[in-house]
Structures are given as structure tokens and as C-alpha cells.
């Protein structure tokens, strides 16, 4: 196992990771509330932790990765009623859609994906413990609240002081007259007519949002585990409340390291459903190849805000295509190479970047340098060196989950573009006609064929190994 540094949101600085168990990392990431299709902000969280875990495993770490599913929630109930379907029908459909989207983005499945409704008993046990310890109290309306003033360290993750906060800091926190203090948050919601509920010591009801993650994470990973992650928007109140209720319940430190993925912005504003400026993953995949979306996410540091636009995705497509072109040029001459010999200097430079808080922009810069060296070696017919560069680049791009598709299929992908009026055979025939024209020194005729293909959306690229074609951007 190689040591690495990560930014701990609680300490507000980069620190060296020290595992609780040698060689092992327990990680919990807040997943989706499944009442709609995932948007591009969800994609960023899924992809970021996917490449982080891929890298850690490549470094010899044994990672146990848990990502939960919230399948009971006010929004889920509302949407199911609007659709005139059961909650189970709604959530099952969107869980399937979420998994399909994640797979297309190249994300491996988590080791476990617990659903909130499967842990109701564990949530009730945690709430009972909090009530018994005096950290929570039942209200007359059937709700149970966590008493924030009883937890002295409240605010340590977000850096907020209790006295400075305002009630209703999040749309997910209700202001109720039954609270002792306006910042107290609900652990158990008393049953309402025509809503799902479970029997409990406090009457029929259902869990609050925050208690779900505390119960699922501690049941899957234990009271005290290594890394908890999620989107930056969850820092407060969700993660702050998780810390309070978990530590008040168990008496142990909840998490050693907190990791938060930055916002995706649209026109300078955070992308969110509440602002109505969000794009579903499926919306974007209609216009761009899923791996282009993944590259767009990987190319920015996971903590940095990133601006979403068609221009940015087109730039991502152009950049990703450079790797595919390099592989195509090599494979046309030498075929696919499964050698194990790699360039250790490039690998170490890549690893150094990734060990520094998963610095993907720096890591990708190393990959582009390696890509240039591969192109040079192929051009200069340095077969042995080209093979080493090829195998090394294949290895490192795989760690980031990039360049994982068939080269020709990717280069000729028509996602988001009009269907070509020419077949592959017709394009190849025109390429041959152009080659014949050049051989006959009919350069104007050759140029005319190139332009005719370009007018049809086909770009030709002449290489030492022959002429390649791809779709125009």
C-alpha cells in the first residue's frame, strides 16, 4: 500500500491518510434519493468516487465502498402520488435508471448499496438510544427530535456556530412548533394520512433523512470508520447532523476523514433541481458519448467547482479523442499489445499526482505527455518503445476509467449528431479514390474528395499508416 494525502473537510486542510486497519479503507458515500432521473451533479459524485476507489485499489488498498439509496422521503411520496403509483414502483424504476446511468459512465457498482427501508429497525434502535441518553426527545405530535444544544461539538464540520445559525438552513429541515430549539432536527416523523409508516415506540411514523445515513453507515461499516463522502451541498445540515446523532448515540468518533465533491455550475449558479437549471445524465448522453461526460468530470479536480456547458463537453470530446487516435495509430501498425512491460517513470509521475488529494488535472497532464511520446514512437517506427508507451497509457487510462471503448466505435460514434448519409463502405471507397488521385498527382481531385467527405460530416486524418476517418465534432 502506498501512502496518500487527502483533503479532510473537517480539518480544512490536506492530511496524510492513516487507516484504522492496516491496508484497509472503509468508505461510505451518500447516494441518491430515487424519485427522478439522476442529474449531472449526481454523475460527478458517482464518477469522482469511482476513480478515487479505482486508484486506491491500484495502489494495493483493500477498499470497502458503501453507497446508500434513499427510498423513503417526502419527495418520493409526493412524486408517487402525482404519478398514481406505489412508492416501491417509483423507487424501483429510478434505482434501475440510476444503475444504468452509472454503468454507462463506467462506474463500478459499490460493494453494498443499502436501502433506507431495509434499515428501519436499526434506525429505531439508534433513536431509542438517543432518547434514553437524553440527546433526543419525543414531541406530542409523534415526531422525535435531536436536541442540538446537547451536542457540544455541533458545527465542527461546517464551521458554523449554533448561535449564528438561522432556522431553516436547508429545504430538508422543517421548522416545527414542537421543537425545543429551532435548530433541532427530526429523527422520526409521526405518521400522516395516506403516507407509509412503520410501528415504533413513539407511534406509527417514518425516519427522518439524517438518521437514515447514520444507521446504514454504522451497520455496514461499524460505529467508527475511515472516510465519509458526498456532494458539497450535504456538508450542512446533513453531514453535520450525521456526526451529532452518531457520536451522541455510540459515544465514539464517527468518521476520520470527510470528502466533499465540488458543485457543478451553470452560468455561474450551482446546478440544482430547486433552481431549475439541472440536466439529467440522460439529457446529456443524448448529445455526448458517456465517456466524454466522464472525461469532463475526471479532468477537473474533484473539489473544484466546474462550469457545465456544451462548449466544455466539446472540449472534453476533443481531448479524449486524442487518446483514441493514438491507440488507433499504434494498433493499425502493431495490433493490440498485452505486454506487461511499462514505463515506470510515467507511472510514478501519475501516481504522485493522484496521491496528492487525487489531483486528476495533473495526472491527465502526465497522460497527455505520454500520449505525445506514443505518437512520436509510432511515427519514428520505434516498435519496442512504442509498445511500452502503449501498454503504460492503457494501464493508466484504465485506472481513471477512460478510453475503455472500442477505438473505432468511439471515433465513429454518432451520439448527438445527425446520421451520416454515407456508409462505412462508401467512406472507405472515397478514401481509396482520394489515395488513387494523390498517386496520380491529381491533388485538386484529392482535395475535392476530402472536402466532399467533410461536407458529409467526415474528417480525414492522414497518418504514416494510412488515412483514418472520424466524425466531425
UniProtKB/Swiss-Prot annotation:
Segments carrying motif 'KMSKS' region: 270-274
Family matches, as SUPFAM superfamilies: Anticodon-binding domain of a subclass of class I aminoacyl-tRNA synthetases, Nucleotidylyl transferase
Binding-site list for Zn(2+): 30, 213, 238, 242
This protein's record includes keyword Coiled coil: no
InterPro entries: Cys-tRNA-ligase, Cys-tRNA-synt_Ia_DALR, Cys-tRNA/MSH_ligase, CysS_C, Rossmann-like_a/b/a_fold, tRNA-synt_1_cat_dom, tRNAsynth_Ia_anticodon-bd
Residues annotated to bind ATP: 273
EC class name: ligase
EC numbers: 6.1.1.16
Primary residence: cytoplasm
Keywords: Aminoacyl-tRNA synthetase, ATP-binding, Cytoplasm, Ligase, Metal-binding, Nucleotide-binding, Protein biosynthesis, Zinc
Cofactor remark from the record: Binds 1 zinc ion per subunit.
GO BP annotations listed: cysteinyl-tRNA aminoacylation
Extent of motif 'HIGH' region: 32-42
Reactions that this protein is recorded to catalyse: tRNA(Cys) + L-cysteine + ATP = L-cysteinyl-tRNA(Cys) + AMP + diphosphate
GO molecular function, one term: zinc ion binding
Compartments reported by the entry: Cytoplasm
GO CC terms: cytosol
Domain of life: Bacteria
Required cofactor(s): Zn(2+)
HAMAP family: Cys_tRNA_synth
Protein family according to the UniProt entry: Belongs to the class-I aminoacyl-tRNA synthetase family.
Quaternary organization: Monomer.
Record's protein name: Cysteine--tRNA ligase
